[in-house]
Amino acid sequence: MEYVVMIIILLALFFIFTVFLNTRYSFDEKCLVLKFGLSKTEIPINQIVSIKESDKYGVADNIDYKIGMPYAQPDRIVIETTNKRFLVFLNGAQQFIQKYKRVSV
């Protein structure tokens, strides 16, 4: 019985970690979709001006929105659109930039 309770607790912690503490992203034909916790942010690809890596730890100039947890994920990306700037905390910044380049062509 003790093992069953332990397994349930571990599964619950795993679920919380994967859903609430990771920044997930996907690209479709027209939008970049960023998900963190229960929030979902859609950025039209045609409005993205630039995407670059950042070394800022939660503080950056003129950032309108922060997506993700600064200390749980090692990579930071600044997404600049025509009217907003996003600081995104995620894993795999290089893969993100490569996927964006393939989609934005």
UniProtKB/Swiss-Prot annotation:
It is found in: Cell membrane. The keyword Signal does not apply. The chain crosses the membrane at residues 1-21. One of its GO terms (biological process) is bacteriocin immunity. InterPro entries: PH_SunI-like (IPR055365). Disruption phenotype: Loss of resistance to the bacteriocin sublancin 168. One of its GO terms (cellular component) is plasma membrane. Residues 22-105 are cytoplasmic. It is a single-pass membrane protein. Induction: Expressed during both exponential and post-exponential growth (at protein level). The keyword Transferase does not apply. It comes from the Bacteria. Keywords: Cell membrane, Membrane, Transmembrane, Transmembrane helix. It holds the Pfam family bPH_8. Is essential and sufficient to confer resistance to the bacteriocin sublancin 168. This is Sublancin immunity protein SunI. It comes from Bacillus subtilis (strain 168).
